[in-house]
Amino acid sequence: MCILCDSAPALTELKIDIKAASLDQPEVIALITALNADLIERYPEDGSNHFRLDPEEVAPGRGVFLVAYVDGHPAGCGATRLIDPQTAEIKRMYVVPEFRGRGIAGRVLEGLERHARSLGARQIVLETGERQPEALALYTRAGFERIPLYGEYIDSPLSMCMGKPLHA
C-alpha cells in the first residue's frame, strides 16, 4: 500500500473519505512527517517549535485527528482540540502536494468544525503564516478572519492567527 502516493487520481475519479485516526497509525505518521518537512522548508528560521501534537489533545471528548483518504490513499489531515470549553483550535492541516486543489482541505476543515461544535465549542481558532498562501485562501473562504496572536504564538513574529464563531 502506498503511504503517500506518487500519482494522484484524476479529479473526476476522486472518492474522498474522511475518517478519525490515531496519531500512531503509519499513514498519520507519514502525513505529519511530510507536514513538518513542508513547514521547515517554508519557515527554516522557526525550527520545529510548534510542530507538536499531544495524543491526549485529540483524545475522545477533547478533540479529533482526521485523515482524508482518496481512493484508499491518505491525501490530507487535520486536527482540532479544545483549548477551553468554548474554543476549539485547528492543528496540523495538510494535504499531500499531488492532491492539492481538489477540495480535500475544505472537506477536512468542515469535518473539524463539525467535531468542534459537537464538543460544545462556540468559536474556532488557528495559527498559520503568510508563507502559506494556500492555507490563508482556504481559511478566508471558510469565513475565518485575522485575530490577535494567542497562546504559544503571542511572541511569534512569523505567526498569523485566525478565528470565527461556530454556529449551531
For each predicted feature, which ranges?
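Acetyl-CoA-dependent GNAT
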Residues: 13-91, 96-98, 109-111, 115, ...
